[in-house]
Amino acid sequence: MASFRQSALALTATLSLAYAWLPSTTPLRGVNLGGQFIVEPWMMESEWSTMGCSGQADEWSCVQSLGQDKADAAFQSHWGRWITQSDFEDMHNYGLNTVRIPTGYWMKEDLVKDGEYFPRGGLEYLLKVCGWAADQGIYVILEQHAAPGAQANSNSFTGHSTTAGFYTSENYDRGVEYVAWLANLTYNHNEMRTVGTIGVLNEPLNWDNKVSTLVTDFYPAAYKAIRAVEPSGGNPLHIQFMGSKWGSGSPESSLPSGYTDVSFEDHRYLKWDTSVSVTQDEYIQTSCTSDRTAAGEDPTYVTEWSLSPPDDVESTDGWSKGSQKEFYGNWFAAQVQGFEKSAKGWTFWTWKSTLGDYRWSYQGAVTAGVAPKDLDSLASSTVCG
């Protein structure tokens, strides 16, 4: 890969210099490690059952049900088996250069208040996973996917499927402390030598008046806190915000004057975009031509997308994952070409699931022949004309 931004991280004297790079001329091509540090039961029910959490809505309810010690053991077993070193070898062999790792604020265990229920012991496994990525030369985005109080309503990706309660000064402070802690880890652990981006918050509420303080208070505080832990003279981490296309306001509007090394993320799931006609031709056309970078938000990366159509058609003949592999291969190519043209690259949601459905699994899509083992081969695809 050519023309990387190469950042020499200032590590302790006992650690080797590490290099975190951000693809520039070569697109970011990657996957999410969904389900690793934040379990979403809908996409991994058999694993959830193995953990003893069957019937529970989220991590909070599972920990509360099992009790802390039993839950800690169950989650630590999960963290040790869901993503393994061989997964990163496969990613590298498939031409992927990036992983986005969703994490919850409870990984910094002193942020968890009495009456909150989350598993303990995750940091050891996060370091291990980042080390495996680094061994394969894979760039890492660390994301605050689940924030204190939950940033979205009734969604397991927040760790607690409840009414969004993140939008308070107290929880903003905890969220800021968490992303600063993540940033500090990257300078003090050799395993994190290819971590180059901190995502400050996944999928906040959109089109809601609560988010005004997200933009005016939380975003600038998070930016300043991350910059404050960076060593002087070192190249800075990229700090990533949900772009304005998400609908939570303009993230850069309240950042400090002269802010640097900021990137933006877009999530693009056509299955939930009711403005797009549900036809194969329209899905291909839209994927080829949709501009995913808002004005003033360069670079933007499409950090979540899939091959899943709307729920009401996904099992019909015209959208069957069994009989329509040719279409799904073309749609995969169209999205890749579109995201690499209108943005700076992408990370697919997700690497693996237990759904038995390659439309939600990059690993499964490669096995099914829908995603190629050589991504460069898509350059010759004529799907977008």
Predicted regions and their residues:
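Fungal secretory targeting signals
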Residues: 1-21
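N-terminal module-boundary/linker segments of secreted carbohydrate-active enzymes
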Residues: 16-41
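Hydrophobic faces of well-ordered beta-strands that scaffold small-molecule active sites
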Residues: 29-33, 99-101, 140-144, 198, ...
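Active-site-adjacent substrate/metal-binding segments within catalytic domains
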Residues: 39-120, 346
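An active-site-proximal structural segment forming one wall of the substrate-binding cleft
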Residues: 73-99, 113-146, 157-197, 225
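Helix C-cap/helix->beta junction micro-motif
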Residues: 135-137, 233, 342
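Extracellular glycoside hydrolase catalytic/binding regions
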Residues: 190, 197, 201-340
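Aromatic-rich peripheral "rim/lid" segments of glycoside hydrolase catalytic domains that contact
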Residues: 318-322, 327-334, 338-385
